[in-house]
Each structure stands twice: as structure tokens, then as C-alpha cells.
Amino acid sequence: MHLYRSHTCGALSRGDVGQTVRLSGWVHRKRDHGGVLFVDLRDHYGMTQIVADADSPALPILEALRVESVVTIDGEVKARSEGTVNANLSTGEIEVFARVATVLSAAEELPMPVAGEQEYPEDIRLRYRFLDLRRETLHANIVKRTKVISDMRRRMEGAGFTEYSTPILTASSPEGARDFLVPSRIHPGKFYALPQAPQQYKQLLMVAGFDRYFQIAPCFRDEDPRADRLPGEFYQLDLEMSFVTQEEVWETMEPVIGGVFEAFADGRKVTPIGSFPRIPYAEAMLKYGSDKPDLRNPIIISDVSEEFAQSGFGLFEKIVGTGGVVRLIPAPNTADKSRKFFDEMNDWARAEGHAGLGYVTRKQGEFGGPIAKNHGADKMAALFDRLGLGPDDGCFFAAGKAEQAAKLAGAARTRVADQLGLIDKDRFELCWIVDFPFYEWDEENKKVEFSHNPFSMPQGGLDALNTQDPLTINAFQYDLVCNGFEIASGSIRNQSPETMVKAFEIVGLSKADVEERFGGLYRAFQYGAPPHGGMAAGVDRIVMLICGAQNLREITLFPMNQRAEDLLMGAPSPAALKQLRELNIRVVEQTKG
């Protein structure tokens, strides 16, 4: 017999009754039933119930052990009595009567429990991540993550893609987030950077004559912590294709991403492959108040600026007259809601930094609220009829500058749906957001900036850059969204040196700046560059959605905390003086004040 096990803890069944077996694993739980000890023995594969009675030499050994100790059990497989079968375990029809117990590693008192799913402080969970990873849900999430990535690879290879690895040490790039810099020992005073994404390398692969590249790429960004993003490191399914239009990218990737969701849906509905809605950015901002719309939410925002332009309702009329907008957010079937519901929504909007959220109530066709009183019942009825709202539907209003009103309306749309229980949690709703603006106005610096990816092809090409107002130019850029999360982003690339120079010129960078900052790509484009495009899908977010996890730390092996600290390994940490000298680096204390 094998030194440690003849079977795993998830392998035994009724067909093994009568066999002598050897199992090894962790003591998950212990239950003392007066001279009979029941132990749940756990390994990576499952759980088996071990029984030790007064006649078993294993009893005193197991009684003395703390949970999470590692043991080897020799014993006989027996069938459980009918009333004690556990249908929740693959081994639930049997138990192993222990004859011998060998302690492989005794556990100290635990700083946190492993059995059960109770909440525990995050700093403890991260400091003792090796214990946290033993917990059932987190352990299953990590296993599922690996299976999702394997499924992605299989689907990409099936679609004709080949995996290539691009460098981890590269040059610092000025666009995007801050780089993680790596000092060069051989070249004092110079630095490598960890890649924020393999963007330039994958485009260079297309110029080099490769086609249909992909990799599961680690990406590094020195960003301030955010609730929906892990600090430091993340992974993306990165891909690029030559001689393609954006429609061909969508048609190629829907079976991959949609197929992954279908494979791990576990009964949840998924938007059918080939029918992902394609929503222009401007339409998304109007109807959903977001470029990451959750299409499980049935609420549609409407622009009602014209209705209030000459309405006599002073506040809205003034806003529209000075170039602002009024957006209406339906609140369906709220006739039974008290005024408190509507007032709390208004209070919430103010707490979020907005002027407020106006509202109209309606019950059996009768309107209520100050806006309805000022606007008049007939006008409100006509507006409700035009929008298809019913006799028991209320609504909210977001008014102000277009961007601010859209943001408030989008947040209100989400909050109303949550409050009213309108979102079906058992669906994955996917859609493409297309026709992003190529440029945007940077109010703080009073200048035009790229809104998305500077390497994208502007719609209309060089001619559009030369003749149009930059803020009216759209790009061949697109995002893939699922349930309110951006899970992928991509574009058709700009492979023309002239167009590239002009695009950067509009944001204030000269040809010399382009050659200095993006020299490799710029030079490559002068030697025959094919039309190409691609995208990158966030592996972490896709896995988070599939697992139904609340945050990215629940699907990541060894994440940092929100202060970008690895509490388990103690990173970041001071470097030894010898290391600093070799790198020609001196640490300067920050002065306070």
C-alpha cells in the first residue's frame, strides 16, 4: 500500500465497503459522541467521515489532535446506516472505521477557523492565507479559476489562436496608470518597467507576420486601490488578429467568452452566442447612464428635456435653457411605496454629492409630488403615456449638465432596481458597447485627451483628424460588458505612422515625442503593418462573476490588501543596503509638512 494513501478523501463509495484503505488529510471537524469519535477528514478532493470507538487504538491519538492537524488513517470501509447517509458528500454513503492513526503534522491553535463560512477580519485572512485557502468556498473558487483559464485556452486554440509569451521586463510607457519600475544594475540610473499590458508587443507581433496571438498575460499597474480592482497585479486574456474588422473580432470572441460563461453557468441563463447586443456609447449613456450597463435591470432612462423646456416649471426650464438636460428614471409598480421611499432616494443623491433627485408618485393614475403639481396632471399623463409608464409607476428626475445628469441617472437606475428587487441574479447578460469617443475634454487641465486607447483607429482615419472637431470623432473601440462589469476592452488599431502622429499631435505631443515614447511601434509601422485589432478580457472579473464572489480577493490565490500590502509575505519591504548599493540607489526619507 502507498505510504500515505490508497484513495483520496473524495473517492470512496458503497462499492468499496469491506476494503481496508489508507487516507491522508486534514482533521476538518471532530464530534465526540460519548466514547465514539467522528472525524471529518478533508483533502483537496473531498471529505470522508472517520469513526474511532473505544476498541480503536486510533481513538486517543485523534482525541488529542487539534483540528487542521494532518494525519494518515488506516481502516475499514463500512456502509452508513440508512438514517445517517449524507447526500451532500460524494462519500456520504460510507465511513471508515479507524484502526491506526499516524500524525504527520500537528496543528497549533488556529488564528481563524477553517470549517464553516463565517466572516472573519480581512487582515487575519490575508496574513494566514494558507489557512483561508483551505476554506471550502475559497478553495472551490481557486479551482474553478484554473478550470476557467483552461477552458479559455482550449477555446482560443480551437478558434485558431496560438499562445505567445511577451516580455515582463520592458520600457516605461507614459500612457495609462503609473508603472512599476525595476532598477537596472548593469545600467545605473536606468529602469525597466513591468508591463501594464502587452499592448505594443502584441501589435508588433502582427507587424512581424504572426496572426491570431493570445496569452493569459500578467499585467502590473501602480494604481490607487479601488473596490473593483486589486492593487498591483491582474491577469487578462490578451489577443490580437491581423486583417480583421471590428465585427470579425466580435464574431470571433463571442463564442469564446460566451462559451466560457455557458460552460460554468450552473443553470444560470447566458445571452445566446451571436446575439450580444451592440450598443453605441452615446445610447448607453442615455438609456442606462453608464458605459457598463447591467442589462438584467429592466429600467430604461429617458431624456425628457424637451417636455420641460417651455413647461413653466422654473427649475427644470432654467436647467434646459442653459444647456442642461433632464433625465427620467422609472420606478415601476411603486404605488404602495410611501413617501419615505422617494425621500430616501433624494437624500441618497445628495449624500453622493448631487443637488438632489426629483420624483413623481402615481397611484391608480393619480399623480403626487411637487414636480407633478407644478408641471400639471395633463402634461404628466401625456409624458407617462409617451414613455409607456403605467398607472402605478412612479419616476425620478436627474437634471443638470449632461455628464452629471447621466451619472446620477445611471446610479439611481441601479439603486431603484436593487430596492425594488428587479434584477434577476441567475442571468449573465452580455453586450458590446461600441463607437466610443476617440477624445474627451480634460476639464482640470483644459485640454483634449484620449478617452480610451491612444493606439486605436479613429473612425474616418486621417481625414477625420484633419477636418473634424476632435470631440466629435469616434473610434473603432469597443468594450464587452456583463452584468454591469466591463469584462473586456479592445479596438481596431491605428497602423498608419501619419495617422498616429496626427492623433498624438491633437493631445499636444509632437512627432519627436511619439518617436521617443513609442519608437518601437512607430518604426515598425514604417515597414509594412497589416490592419489589425484585438482586445483583452479581464480573467479575474470573469471568474468573479462566474463564482458569484463579492470581490476579486475571493478568486485570487494571494492577493494584496487595499493598501497594496502582502501581509503573508511582508511585501513591500526594505531592501538590504548591499542590494541598494549594487543598484546605485539611495533611499531618501520623506520630509513631513
Swiss-Prot record:
Principal location: cytoplasm
Pfam families: GAD, tRNA-synt_2, tRNA_anti-codon
SUPFAM superfamilies for this protein: Class II aaRS and biotin synthetases (SSF55681), GAD domain-like (SSF55261), Nucleic acid-binding proteins (SSF50249)
Binding-site positions, L-aspartate: 175, 221, 452, 493
Superkingdom of origin: Bacteria
One MF annotation (Gene Ontology) recorded for this entry: ATP binding
Residues that coordinate or bind ATP: 221-223, 486, 538-541
Site (Important for tRNA non-discrimination): 33, 83
Protein name listed in UniProt: Aspartate--tRNA(Asp/Asn) ligase
Species for this entry: Novosphingobium aromaticivorans (strain ATCC 700278 / DSM 12444 / CCUG 56034 / CIP 105152 / NBRC 16084 / F199)
